[in-house]
Structure formats: C-alpha cells, structure tokens
Amino acid sequence: MKKLVLVVDAPEESFSGERFVSLVAPSFPQVSFQITSRRDGSGPGYAEADAIFGYAHQFAEGMLSAAKSLKWIQSFTTGVDGILRLKSLRPEVFLTSMRGMHGPQMSEMTFLHMLALSRDYPRILDNQRNRNWERIPKPTMSGKTVVILGVGAIAAALARRCKAFDMEVIGVSSSPRPVPDFDRIMARSDLAAAAALADFLVVLVPLSPQTQGIIDAGILAAMKPSAYLINVARGGVCNENDIIAAVRDKRIAGAGLDVFSTTPLPADHPLWNTPGILLTPNLGGMSTTYLEQTVPISMQNLKCLVENRLGDLINVIPH
C-alpha cells in the first residue's frame, strides 16, 4: 500500500508544492503525494496522511487533529516552535526540521549586517541621496572578534566565512566542545564574559525556555561600546526594549535585527526609527533556491518512511 504524503503549499513563501513534488516524487513511486492549500484540516488527504510537509507557521490545531494516521511531520524550516506549541501534536508523531540547510543565506545575511553597521552603510546611502561627498575611514573586519551564541550547523557555516575574513571566532554553547573553525568555545553560563570580548555578538540559537530573553540588559552592558549585536535567530531570544535602550544610550555601537518578537513588526514599533539599528524583514533564511535546498533532507527522510525506518530520520526534534 502506498504511503500518503501531504504537502502544504506556501505561495506566501514563494514555495510551490507542485514544484517540490516534481523534484522528489520520481524517486519514490511507493509514495502518493498530494498538495493542499487548506490549513484547517478540512481538505482531502488529512485523515489518511502518513506524513505532512510544510512550513512550521502553517500548522494549526485542526490540521493535526484531523490527521489521524499521521506518523511524521517534516518542517521546511529550522525553527519549529510554531508546531511544538500545538496541543494536538501527539507524542508518537516524529517531527523533523531543515536544520543545517540555511548556512549559506544566513551567513550572508549576518555579514550584510556586520559590514553595513561597521561601515555605516546607512550614512553612505543618505550621502548618496543628498549628493554629499563624504569620506570617513572605518575599521576592517580583519582581526575583529565575532562571538556566536550557538554552535550548530548555521553557526559553523558562519564561522568558516568569518575565518576567511581573518576574524577570531568564539562560540558560546550549552555543551562546550571543540568545533572546527572556532578558535574556542565558551559555556553559555559564561555568556557575559564572552560578550565582553565581542566586536560582533551574533545570536544563532533556537528559541526555547532556556534562551527566551537571554540577550538582555545585563549581557548588553557587558559588551564594549564599539561592539555590535546581530540577531538572525529568533526575536524572542533578545529583549528588544533593552536593545533600543543600549543603542540609544550608545552603550553599544549598534544592532542588526532580522527577527522580531512580533512579525510583521508593527509600524509604530520604536525599532523602526532608532538610529543605529538596522532592520531586515525575516530575510535571513530566504533564497531563490530555497525549495531546491529542502530536497536532500526531504529525500533522505522519505527513504526512511518508505522503508518503515522512521527511527532513522535525520534532524528529529524531541517533543
């Protein structure tokens, strides 16, 4: 009997379910793929689905309640807190993510923020608009210290690129261990001490009860006045009011934020007009090849489904 995999279409993410299925289905004749745009569980296929593929933010209580035969959820995202908070997520259902897939685009977005802030690119753009020829020397990245909170696959990709810029790379982890391309790893309990060393403090940890609000006034106070904070992880990891105060009072040099506690960021939020804060609207994980990037992990895990080896799925998220 064929396995049934339901793929939730995501046009708002420029993700075509039809295109995804066209790439993976030829390798899995044992699987029947069905595309749905319904996210309340009322559409066809939910009751019989062995697996559901979709973006974490698409999942809702009704969807999982209707999926009586569900054995596995494959998220097209790294963060899965949108799924984990659902009461209808049954403990026996496997949940997997796209952890590690976003290294190239997340690293590049981090560098965009680091370079734009350290070179004061907003001022350069203002000068261009005003036809003002102003030349101000700025520091190079070479020799600077980047402290990365989190040492997962995306952090490892960033570390490699930082070494290419001749930067010192320090990781902060809840389980310190040697990691390639990091000069050293410090314990999360020593985050304040690590922050004091940073020219750039980059946040790359998932949102969890342990990381909620971990970047607060205390950590920001430990940073050098010349240092920058970059958050490309989850908005809830940082206290936004504390960031605004630290930048406004020039206790840190600035901040680059791609993620926020509320998305979309409300038009009246003070982050929009705080000088020294650079905002990008959740662009870090996006790329024009995102759909294609999801295929290798999806295919490896689909092989486990058809061979009834769900215990061998990769990127399993405990819940």
Report residues per predicted region.
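Glycine-rich NAD(P)-binding loop of Rossmann-like domains
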Residues: I124-A157, R184-I185
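Rossmann-like adenosine-cofactor binding region
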Residues: P176-P270
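Short, conserved loop/helix-junction motifs that constitute active-site signature segments
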Residues: G62-S69, L86-P91, L220-P225, A246-K250, ...
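N-terminal glycine-/charge-rich "phosphate-binding" loop or analogous flexible N-terminal tail
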Residues: M1-A51
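C-terminal helix-to-coil terminal segments
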Residues: F20, T96-M109, R123, T263-H319
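NAD(P)-binding Rossmann-fold cofactor-contacting core
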Residues: A164-D181
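Phosphate/diphosphate ligand-binding glycine-rich loop within oxidoreductases
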Residues: D50-L125
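Short acidic low-complexity segments
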Residues: T36-Y46, E61-G62, D183-L197
